[in-house]
Protein backbone atom coordinates (compact mmCIF):
# COMPACT_ATOMS: atom_id res chain seq x y z
CA UNK A 1 0.00 0.00 0.00
CA UNK A 2 1.45 3.33 -1.06
CA UNK A 3 1.35 5.86 1.74
CA UNK A 4 2.17 8.78 -0.53
CA UNK A 5 -0.29 7.68 -3.22
CA UNK A 6 -3.21 7.62 -0.77
CA UNK A 7 -2.84 11.26 0.30
CA UNK A 8 -5.27 13.50 -1.64
CA UNK A 9 -3.83 16.44 -3.57
CA UNK A 10 -5.48 19.77 -2.74
CA UNK A 11 -6.32 22.09 -5.63
CA UNK A 12 -5.83 25.83 -4.89
CA UNK A 13 -8.43 28.40 -5.97
CA UNK A 14 -6.69 29.72 -9.11
CA UNK A 15 -5.75 26.28 -10.48
CA UNK A 16 -7.97 24.40 -12.93
CA UNK A 17 -7.66 20.64 -13.41
CA UNK A 18 -9.21 18.66 -16.25
CA UNK A 19 -8.91 14.98 -17.16
CA UNK A 20 -9.47 13.91 -20.74
CA UNK A 21 -8.81 10.32 -21.85
CA UNK A 22 -5.56 9.37 -20.09
CA UNK A 23 -4.15 12.89 -19.90
CA UNK A 24 -4.50 15.27 -16.97
CA UNK A 25 -4.34 19.00 -17.77
CA UNK A 26 -3.43 21.55 -15.10
CA UNK A 27 -3.76 25.28 -15.73
CA UNK A 28 -2.70 27.93 -13.24
CA UNK A 29 -1.54 31.52 -12.91
CA UNK A 30 2.06 30.70 -13.92
CA UNK A 31 1.46 28.30 -16.81
CA UNK A 32 -0.05 25.11 -18.21
CA UNK A 33 1.15 21.53 -17.73
CA UNK A 34 -0.12 18.12 -18.74
CA UNK A 35 0.78 14.53 -17.88
CA UNK A 36 -0.14 11.30 -19.62
CA UNK A 37 -1.26 8.56 -17.23
CA UNK A 38 -0.25 5.01 -18.16
CA UNK A 39 -1.10 1.77 -16.40
CA UNK A 40 -4.23 0.99 -14.41
CA UNK A 41 -4.27 4.24 -12.44
CA UNK A 42 -7.52 6.16 -11.87
CA UNK A 43 -7.56 9.89 -11.26
CA UNK A 44 -10.66 11.10 -9.40
CA UNK A 45 -11.23 14.87 -9.38
CA UNK A 46 -13.56 16.08 -6.62
CA UNK A 47 -14.45 19.68 -5.73
CA UNK A 48 -11.05 20.84 -4.55
CA UNK A 49 -8.89 17.71 -4.38
CA UNK A 50 -7.53 14.93 -6.55
CA UNK A 51 -7.42 11.30 -5.45
CA UNK A 52 -5.16 8.80 -7.20
CA UNK A 53 -6.34 5.16 -7.10
CA UNK A 54 -5.00 1.98 -8.63
CA UNK A 55 -7.21 -0.72 -10.13
CA UNK A 56 -4.93 -3.70 -9.50
CA UNK A 57 -2.34 -4.43 -6.85
CA UNK A 58 0.45 -5.74 -9.06
CA UNK A 59 4.03 -4.51 -8.76
CA UNK A 60 3.90 -2.05 -11.68
CA UNK A 61 0.73 -0.32 -10.48
CA UNK A 62 2.05 -0.06 -6.92
CA UNK A 63 5.13 1.70 -8.27
CA UNK A 64 3.11 4.06 -10.48
CA UNK A 65 0.58 4.93 -7.75
CA UNK A 66 2.85 7.12 -5.63
CA UNK A 67 4.72 8.40 -8.69
CA UNK A 68 1.65 9.86 -10.38
CA UNK A 69 0.40 11.37 -7.13
CA UNK A 70 3.70 13.23 -6.69
CA UNK A 71 3.84 14.26 -10.36
CA UNK A 72 0.35 15.77 -10.08
CA UNK A 73 1.25 17.44 -6.77
CA UNK A 74 4.40 18.99 -8.29
CA UNK A 75 2.47 20.17 -11.34
CA UNK A 76 -0.14 21.90 -9.16
CA UNK A 77 2.52 23.42 -6.91
CA UNK A 78 4.46 24.58 -9.97
CA UNK A 79 1.62 26.36 -11.75
CA UNK A 80 0.55 27.98 -8.47
CA UNK A 81 3.85 28.90 -6.73
CA UNK A 82 6.65 27.89 -9.10
CA UNK A 83 10.03 26.32 -8.37
CA UNK A 84 13.51 27.75 -7.99
CA UNK A 85 17.01 26.27 -8.31
CA UNK A 86 20.14 28.15 -7.31
CA UNK A 87 23.58 27.36 -8.67
CA UNK A 88 26.89 28.84 -7.57
CA UNK A 89 30.05 29.38 -9.61
CA UNK A 90 33.13 28.76 -7.48
CA UNK A 91 36.49 29.55 -9.03
CA UNK A 92 38.76 32.43 -9.91
CA UNK A 93 37.50 34.21 -13.02
CA UNK A 94 34.30 32.19 -13.33
CA UNK A 95 31.60 34.49 -14.69
CA UNK A 96 28.02 34.28 -15.90
CA UNK A 97 25.97 36.73 -17.95
CA UNK A 98 22.27 36.85 -18.72
CA UNK A 99 21.33 38.00 -22.22
CA UNK A 100 17.52 37.68 -22.49
CA UNK A 101 17.25 34.03 -21.39
CA UNK A 102 20.59 33.09 -22.92
CA UNK A 103 23.18 32.09 -20.34
CA UNK A 104 26.77 32.99 -21.22
CA UNK A 105 29.27 31.14 -19.01
CA UNK A 106 32.99 31.75 -18.68
CA UNK A 107 34.11 28.81 -16.55
CA UNK A 108 37.76 28.33 -17.33
CA UNK A 109 37.61 26.90 -20.83
CA UNK A 110 39.26 28.58 -23.82
CA UNK A 111 35.82 29.70 -25.02
CA UNK A 112 32.57 30.90 -23.50
CA UNK A 113 29.73 28.41 -23.20
CA UNK A 114 26.37 29.73 -24.38
CA UNK A 115 23.16 27.98 -23.31
CA UNK A 116 19.77 28.95 -24.67
CA UNK A 117 17.15 28.24 -22.02
CA UNK A 118 13.55 27.12 -22.70
CA UNK A 119 10.86 29.80 -22.64
CA UNK A 120 9.29 28.48 -19.44
CA UNK A 121 12.50 29.06 -17.45
CA UNK A 122 13.47 32.52 -16.25
CA UNK A 123 17.08 33.31 -15.49
CA UNK A 124 18.68 35.65 -13.00
CA UNK A 125 22.41 36.12 -12.39
CA UNK A 126 23.66 37.66 -9.14
CA UNK A 127 27.20 38.98 -9.02
CA UNK A 128 28.18 40.56 -5.72
CA UNK A 129 31.56 41.78 -4.63
CA UNK A 130 33.57 39.25 -2.56
CA UNK A 131 30.93 36.56 -3.14
CA UNK A 132 30.56 33.77 -5.66
CA UNK A 133 28.38 34.33 -8.72
CA UNK A 134 24.90 32.84 -8.38
CA UNK A 135 22.65 31.58 -11.16
CA UNK A 136 18.96 31.49 -10.17
CA UNK A 137 16.60 29.49 -12.38
CA UNK A 138 12.82 29.76 -11.92
CA UNK A 139 10.06 27.79 -13.63
CA UNK A 140 6.66 26.22 -13.11
CA UNK A 141 7.85 22.87 -14.56
CA UNK A 142 9.91 21.04 -11.93
CA UNK A 143 11.12 18.30 -14.27
CA UNK A 144 12.41 20.70 -16.91
CA UNK A 145 13.98 22.93 -14.27
CA UNK A 146 15.88 19.99 -12.78
CA UNK A 147 17.11 18.84 -16.18
CA UNK A 148 18.38 22.31 -17.14
CA UNK A 149 20.05 22.86 -13.74
CA UNK A 150 21.77 19.47 -13.96
CA UNK A 151 22.94 20.25 -17.50
CA UNK A 152 24.46 23.56 -16.37
CA UNK A 153 26.13 21.85 -13.39
CA UNK A 154 27.55 19.11 -15.61
CA UNK A 155 29.52 21.66 -17.64
CA UNK A 156 32.00 22.06 -14.77
CA UNK A 157 31.28 19.72 -11.86
CA UNK A 158 32.92 20.60 -8.54
CA UNK A 159 36.33 19.00 -8.42
CA UNK A 160 37.30 17.20 -5.20
CA UNK A 161 40.62 18.93 -4.44
CA UNK A 162 39.78 22.64 -4.35
CA UNK A 163 36.00 22.51 -4.83
CA UNK A 164 36.06 24.70 -7.94
CA UNK A 165 33.19 24.35 -10.38
CA UNK A 166 29.43 24.80 -10.59
CA UNK A 167 27.41 23.48 -7.68
CA UNK A 168 23.98 23.86 -6.16
CA UNK A 169 23.69 26.27 -3.24
CA UNK A 170 24.28 24.39 0.03
CA UNK A 171 25.67 21.36 -1.83
CA UNK A 172 28.44 19.76 0.19
CA UNK A 173 31.48 18.61 -1.78
CA UNK A 174 33.75 16.12 -0.04
CA UNK A 175 37.30 17.36 -0.51
CA UNK A 176 40.24 15.02 -0.88
CA UNK A 177 43.64 15.69 0.56
CA UNK A 178 46.40 16.32 -1.94
CA UNK A 179 49.76 14.63 -2.10
CA UNK A 180 51.42 14.36 1.26
CA UNK A 181 55.03 15.48 1.54
CA UNK A 182 57.68 12.98 2.60
Swiss-Prot record:
Pfam families (UniProt xref): Ribosomal_L6
Protein name in UniProt: Large ribosomal subunit protein uL6
Keywords, comma-separated and alphabetical: Ribonucleoprotein, Ribosomal protein, RNA-binding, rRNA-binding
Family: Belongs to the universal ribosomal protein uL6 family.
Any GO BP: cytoplasmic translation
SUPFAM superfamilies the UniProt entry points to: Ribosomal protein L6
Quaternary assembly: Part of the 50S ribosomal subunit.
Gene: rplF
Summary of the function given for this chain in its UniProt record: This protein binds to the 23S rRNA, and is important in its secondary structure. It is located near the subunit interface in the base of the L7/L12 stalk, and near the tRNA binding site of the peptidyltransferase center.
A molecular function GO annotation: rRNA binding
Cellular component terms per the entry's GO annotation: cytosolic large ribosomal subunit
Amino acid sequence: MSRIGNIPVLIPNNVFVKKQDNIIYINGPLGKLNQKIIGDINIIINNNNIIVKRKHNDKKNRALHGLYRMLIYNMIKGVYNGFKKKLELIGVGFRAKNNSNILDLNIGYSHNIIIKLPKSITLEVKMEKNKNTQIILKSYDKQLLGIVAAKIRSLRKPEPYKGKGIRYINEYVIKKTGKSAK
